[in-house]
Curated annotation (Swiss-Prot):
Mg(2+) binds at D71, D90. 2-[(2R,5Z)-2-carboxy-4-methylthiazol-5(2H)-ylidene]ethyl phosphate binds at T135, T136, S137, G166. It catalyses: 2-[(2R,5Z)-2-carboxy-4-methylthiazol-5(2H)-ylidene]ethyl phosphate + 4-amino-2-methyl-5-(diphosphooxymethyl)pyrimidine + 2 H(+) = thiamine phosphate + CO2 + diphosphate; 2-(2-carboxy-4-methylthiazol-5-yl)ethyl phosphate + 4-amino-2-methyl-5-(diphosphooxymethyl)pyrimidine + 2 H(+) = thiamine phosphate + CO2 + diphosphate; 4-methyl-5-(2-phosphooxyethyl)-thiazole + 4-amino-2-methyl-5-(diphosphooxymethyl)pyrimidine + H(+) = thiamine phosphate + diphosphate. Condenses 4-methyl-5-(beta-hydroxyethyl)thiazole monophosphate (THZ-P) and 2-methyl-4-amino-5-hydroxymethyl pyrimidine pyrophosphate (HMP-PP) to form thiamine monophosphate (TMP). One of its GO terms (biological process) is thiamine diphosphate biosynthetic process. The gene is thiE. This is Thiamine-phosphate synthase. It comes from Salinispora arenicola (strain CNS-205).
Amino acid sequence: MSSLGRLHLITDNRPGQDPLAVVRAALSVARAELVVQVRVTDETTDRQAYDLARRVTVLCARYGATCLVNDRLHVALAVGADGGHVGADDLPVGAARAVLGSAAVLGATAREADTAVEAVAAGASYLGVGSVHPTTSKDGLPPPIGAAGLRAVAAAVSVPVIAIGGVTAADVPDLRAAGAYGVAVIAALSHAADPARATAAFVEALTC
């Protein structure tokens, strides 16, 4: 999937955050190189998730960027997103593929080579692999897999591998060397004082 963007922005809609402002800033810099994954808190209603995903889908379309919806695949279908992403506790990859259809982009989360191979066989278009570093963006995660774990997964599959978990722009060269096609971030953009400038740093690192 050579057309998949290398920088994945996962939205943060927790109190005090403005996900649409961050998406706009990131799109203005990364344009079609950006993939926006609409992820919302468990407390977010489907209507709220729909409203956010619909607006993000429209923004992404203006730049030729990809919009995915995490977990809530019915929302992805309702807003006409490009696809979705499922984690370990979400729908099985095969079931998610059946829901979204053969043409959709479908991401899946993996930490180990065997589960990565299974996810690809079930229909995953790309894999989000990690957490590669410690992160505070999600509670209850297992220990980070590091560059060695990322390398093992990347060597086992032929689809793009997206490194996630505590990633900074400075980490990109080492992650690319370990086999990552791109990176996924939350705090590095959503909590940045200047999201556009932070996006530019990632784009530069990913295109070197």
